[in-house]
Every structure is written in C-alpha cells, then in structure tokens.
Amino acid sequence: MLGRKQSVRNNEDWKNALDHIEETVSKKELDSLVKKTVKDIKEKCKGKKAAYAWSAGKDSLVLGEICEKAGIDQSVLVRCNLEYPAFIAWIEQNKPSGLEIINTGQDMEWLKKHPDMLFPDKSNKAAQWFHIVQHRGQARYYKEHQLEILLLGRRKADGNYVGKD
C-alpha cells in the first residue's frame, strides 16, 4: 500500500501500485465501494445544488467519475498563470464537459513579489498557496453558482480534513 501521497517519492511506486492493484483491492470490492459512494453522494446531495472540484490529478479523476455516476455534472478547476503549457493542454483535452475554469491570475510578476512561494518547503507555506489559489477560487465558484455542496477529493490517509459525516 502506498500510504500518504506525500511519502511516495517516485513515479515507479505509483506505476507498480497500478500494475498490481488487484492484489490490493479486487474489482468486485472496488465496484462495491464505488456503488456505496455513489449512493452516499446521491443521499447527501438530494435536492441540493452541488458541484465538484476537479484538479486533473489522480484523486479528482476518480472523484469526477463517481460524481458523474451520482448525477453531479458541474465542476470547477482553479488555476493560475504559472501552470505548464503541457498541463493546460492536457486539461483542455481531458476536462469534464461541465467544467468551469477559474484563473486566479498569479503570474511571474506575482511570483517575483512572493519568492517564498516558489518552492515552499514548509507545510504552512504550501497551505498558504492552496488558500491563495484553490480555496479562494473554489469559494468564488461556490458563491457565484449559489451552491449548497462542493465535493472535494481529499484523502484521510493524507491527514486531510474531510468534513463531518
């Protein structure tokens, strides 16, 4: 098992986990978990305006598939102007049909004024970055679309707060 995402240091570990996934979790067990999760989302979102946050990462790809199965087809991706062009192209080629992209505008000029954000080596700096970009953009989307629920792909195994049941 991989454990915390931050502790996986190379891509080979991810590839190995994928190549041997059925040794860890069977297709039958995975299908059962997906079915249960879809049911839970439907119950919690019934009659509420909901969307999901999509980052184009591994966790959000799974979240998107599950949300779509639960009937939630609106999503948001928050980015800035510091993304690699290849990543932006990948997003355009693979984004969900109901995706809205919010650009919070941080660019090279912004980075020159905030050099401590270039390679944040402390968790509080990384958290500050997520607040500046992700959280503000998600809050804007939530408010503009008058949502009641925004589903996020967070993992307990990584120590993330996942809300109350």
Model-derived regions: residue spans:
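ATP-dependent adenylation/nucleotidyltransferase module used to activate substrates
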Residues: 1-165
